[in-house]
A protein has these predicted regions:
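ATP-dependent carboxylate/acyl-activation modules
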Residues: 1-186
Length: 186
């Protein structure tokens, strides 16, 4: 068990802070400050998972959760919006991996899981030609896939809903909420 007070010394200066002893239970979600006071049970579970994740993540963190799992975590950035963007991009990539374009990819037999996962990451990202170029795709796919266009990605991401967002601190500006909404946070 960690000490109740954590101490770190940096260049002769001692910093100390108390251990995070936040109890994560239904009481945590009792003070709803938004206009919509209805939180479905599934959202409470996702929010609890976000808070548990954040409790054990580096300070200044944001977590997106959906369906009982963390789908994007942004930690240790210098500003809250950078955490929100980083975690949101990870959440977007999680959702893009479930698109019909990705689910329909036909991989060569006996491809290793890591190679398949890396190919998917490249396919949904900006470096898609690394896996679609002649001489490359033949080692990964049975059939050369079509490019997953920016317009197709945007259309698929627009269907992302039911995502919960947790933060270990206050969002000082609306830009965080706007960015989170683009990744399905309601």
């Amino acid at each position: 068990v960690p000490e109740p007070i954590e101490r770190k010394q940096v260049f002769g200066v001692t910093f100390e802070q108390g251990r995070n002893e936040l109890v994560i239970d239904d009481k945590l979600f009792s003070n709803i400050v938004t206009e919509n006071k209805n939180i479905p049970e599934s959202a409470k579970i996702d929010l609890a998972i976000a808070m548990i994740t954040l409790k054990y993540t580096q300070s200044n963190s944001v977590a997106y959760t959906c369906g009982g799992q963390a789908i994007g975590i942004g930690a240790g950035q210098q500003s809250r919006i950078h955490c929100t963007r980083l975690a949101g991009t990870k959440a977007d990539n999680w959702y893009l991996r479930q698109s019909p374009q990705v689910m329909g990819l036909q991989f060569v037999d006996n491809i290793r899981r890591a190679d398949r996962d890396n190919a998917i990451d490249l396919y949904i990202g900006e470096d898609y030609m690394d896996v679609l170029a002649d001489g490359a795709w033949e080692n990964i796919f049975k059939v050369k896939p079509a490019v997953f266009t920016t317009e197709e990605k945007k259309a698929w991401l627009a269907t992302m809903k039911g995502v919960a967002l947790g933060s270990d601190a206050f969002f000082p500006f609306g830009d965080n909420i706007e960015r989170a909404h683009r990744s399905g946070v309601e």
